[in-house]
Amino acid sequence: SMKGLLDFHRAHGKVGTIMVTRVEEPAKYGKSVVLSHETGLIDRFVEHGRTYHGNWINAGVYIFSPSIFERIALRPTSMEREVLPELAADDQLYSRQLDGFWMNVKKPREWIEGNALYLSHLRTERPAALLAAGGGDGGDGGSSSGGGSGGAPALGASSAVEGNVLMDASATVGDDCLIGPDVTIGPNCVIGSGVRLAHCVLLEGVKVGAHACVFDSILGWRATVGEWTRVEGVSVLGEDVHLGSEVCLNGALILPHKKLDTSVTTPQIIM
């Protein structure tokens, strides 16, 4: 936890503390962290080569004392390539092992996979936060609050939940929908009747028209998807993007505040 990391940082009294995690293939993540398992003191960071240096890597969560600013040059400076190695060389950098799951998220596909990983974590640790599997009855569908406030989300008649689904209490789902698996629906989203959602993330204020399908994609704030439209192939809709009816989107990245009424069948960026 972050509180545990902060308490550990205050206890050792040095300049920095970083979270580290153990991975099966450290070569995929750049440098390994060589550390003392007894104290957590970091000895050095090493590039992956022919010599094995362990499976611990930088998890990207840092806590520093204010004196860190004295060590950052007044020029473009890399924290990972310059500052952290110098702290380690001066015995001023400690590590704390991450409890729980971790994933490196840099690309849309990784965000979608990370969302599934988080929902799986909720299934184990806080199952009441997820929608209950099964069908809706025009009310709460037998679901919990889905992490929102103000009661349970509304599922329309004959709508069903499959697998892990996190839905804010202010969102609504129409009749005859199939939601899941691995779907997150943010606040004030409106899902029309007959919609199919799977392996996707809908941020706040998204509206999906009747009979649309969204698979393996991310819909940004206040985006709208027209009726009978299909979004798939790791497509990303920026904020305030509006798709017309009967449009097919496959692997498209659409920048914010765009309106699109034609299909995009090959991966590309729409500016």
PLM region descriptions:
Residues 1-4, 110, 196, 213:
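Residue-level recognition of oxygen-bearing side chains
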Residues 3-11, 23-27, 36-126:
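Catalytic-core segments of class I nucleotidyltransferases/pyrophosphorylases
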Residues 19-20:
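Generic beta-sheet signal
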Residues 29, 59, 162-163, 168, ...:
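Short loop/turn microsegments at loop-to-beta-strand junctions
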Residues 53-57, 185, 237:
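A short, polar/proline- and glycine-enriched secondary-structure boundary/capping micro-motif
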Residues 88-205:
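Extended, small-residue-rich solenoid/repeat segments and analogous flexible loops
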Residues 142, 147, 193-271:
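Glycine-rich hexapeptide-repeat left-handed beta-helix
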